[in-house]
């Protein structure tokens, strides 16, 4: 079953492309027709591409991989932030920092700087600074938070990029291509799909369009995360089973040993008792005989 249907896409305006004069010929396979000078995207192909991309994204999430969502255009920023956060993925919705991927160690240093400032605030070091220094550091922290706050948990290069408007985010796409990182993208009729690994032909200018596509993608990722969680629980249970079995066997063995010890002790006591009783009987007989002899005398 498809994750999106034709009617959903139609209602969200996913089919609206750009003016014919702005089109990119490489998008011809995904264009259904032209109407009033505007290209109309073939939604059946969009459905197929969404399903394909969603399945791959689901597997990435299931493997615990990180996917970086990128959308700096006004119409898509909030949608991307909400959807990416819902599945615990990093995102960039402000200006793309040059070298974000190709110079990732430098980006990590900037993120660590944020952590250092936070530590200064907690341990009281910040309070010992002058007003001017406090102001400078506060501004620096706010600037870093705005640009990098949403990727704090990205400790290594992402396994994939999901881009809304590949033309606007061409720097991000180029960096990913250079590093061999797969790119998923919502590609409109004015963009070049050749550098995108998983093309989703769609209107990237309408908020509803972005919301529908991302909704399907993130739903698939959430399924992958849930499956990963379930597998982890099963693995832990499978790991615990032999331990519980060993404990049960040890308890049974301990109980058996205790019973054997008790039986041995009881047998020993019984034997001693029987021996004492026999000895007592012999002594009694000896006394009786001695008394009889004495009487005869």
Residue ranges of each PLM-predicted region?
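Phosphate- and divalent-cation-binding pockets in alpha/beta enzyme and binding domains
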Residues: 78-79, 171, 288
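N-terminal cationic and glycine-rich segments that engage phosphates or anionic surfaces
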Residues: 2-66, 72-73, 77-120, 131-134, ...
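Short glycine/threonine-rich loop/turn motifs
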Residues: 171-234
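Intrinsically disordered, compositionally biased charged tails
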Residues: 1-3, 226-281
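Long, charge-patterned amphipathic alpha-helical coiled-coil/hairpin "stalk" segments used as oligomerization
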Residues: 87-194
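Single conserved hydrophobic/aromatic residue that forms the stacking wall/gate
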Residues: 276-278, 282-297
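Histidine-centered active-site/metal-ligand motif
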Residues: 15-18, 188, 286
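Residue-level signature of catalytic and energy-coupling elements of molecular machines
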Residues: 13, 69, 161, 213
């Amino acid at each position: 079953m498809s994750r999106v249907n034709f009617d959903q896409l139609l209602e969200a305006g996913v089919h609206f492309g750009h003016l014919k004069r702005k089109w990119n010929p490489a998008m011809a396979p995904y264009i259904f027709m032209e109407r009033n000078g505007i290209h109309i995207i073939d939604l059946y192909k969009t459905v197929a591409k969404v399903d394909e991309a969603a399945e791959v994204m689901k597997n990435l999430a299931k493997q615990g991989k990180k996917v970086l969502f990128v959308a700096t255009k006004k119409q898509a920023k909030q949608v991307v932030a909400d959807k990416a956060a819902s599945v615990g993925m990093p995102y960039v919705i402000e200006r793309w920092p040059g070298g974000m991927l190709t110079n990732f160690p430098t980006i990590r240093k900037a993120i660590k700087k944020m952590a250092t400032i936070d530590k200064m605030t907690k341990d009281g070091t910040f309070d010992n600074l002058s007003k001017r220094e406090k102001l400078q550091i506060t501004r620096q922290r706010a600037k870093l938070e705005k640009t990098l706050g949403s990727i704090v948990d990205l400790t290594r290069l992402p396994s994939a990029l999901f881009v809304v408007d590949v033309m606007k985010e061409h720097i991000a796409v180029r960096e990913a291509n250079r590093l061999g990182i797969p790119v998923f993208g919502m590609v409109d009729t004015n963009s070049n799909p050749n550098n995108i690994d998983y093309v989703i032909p769609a209107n990237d200018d309408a908020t509803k369009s972005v919301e529908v596509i991302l909704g399907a993608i993130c739903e698939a990722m959430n399924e992958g995360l849930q499956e990963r969680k379930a597998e982890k629980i099963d693995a832990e249970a499978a790991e615990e089973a032999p331990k519980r079995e060993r404990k049960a066997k040890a308890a049974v063995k301990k109980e058996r040993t205790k019973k054997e010890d008790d039986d041995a002790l009881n047998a020993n006591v019984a034997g001693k008792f029987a021996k004492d009783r026999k000895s007592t009987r012999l002594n009694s007989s000896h006394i009786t005989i001695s008394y009889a002899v004495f009487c005869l005398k």
